[in-house]
Amino acid sequence: SDLSLDRTGRVDIAYMSQLVGCEPEKLIADLGNDIFRNPAAIKDDEPLSGYEEASEYLSGNVREKLKIAREYAKHIDSGFEKNVAALEKVIPKNLEASEISVRIGANWIDVEDYNRFLKEYAKADTSMFGHPVTRTKMGEYKIEGKYQDHSIAANQTYGTSRMSSYHIFENLLNQRDVVIRDRKEVDGKVYYEVNAKETQLAKEKARQMKEAFKSWVWEDIDRREKYVERYNELFNAIRGREYDGSH
């Protein structure tokens, strides 16, 4: 059957039922899984609003649609179980932790967890500042008190004498290059020259930190569940539109 779409691209049930000469309810039943009522498109003053072609409804952010359909089926109208069943069939397969790549600085990781990592991995002394990592409104990360910690952990084990673990972590959080320059002065002119040896040392600490973070994120079971769910909701929720050639 050819579906009549109104000017918004939605299925025009009122118009079609007049055309075929039957009750809207019967038409809706006859169309079966060719159409779905999208809760997000329902208008309160139009009892026949919100119907969409299957290819339209079962594409886009299907995770979000499934969440809404479940709510509607549970609290408003069990008829939405039809939506739930169809969406469950097309939802992208959940990615496991092992299939998700995570990098320091990703904004879907909570700031508290960056703090926790700094404390647990780099043995950061948080007694003075509590939570040194903050994220500004512009999305830039800052680490408070990064000059205060003179421990071996900060300046040797997880950092270097020229770039502490705090500085390295802050650079990684902001996707900045880890590079160390020496101040030089020639004929009263000041310039900065890359110190290759020190840069290499700091880059190696940065590499170790990145690797450690990748496994650290998934080590704790609650943290793993939280981020697997969040990642799938944010980045694995979209389904492309498939046109069914049958009508």
Spans of model-derived segments:
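Charged, low-complexity intrinsically disordered regions
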Residues: 1-230, 235
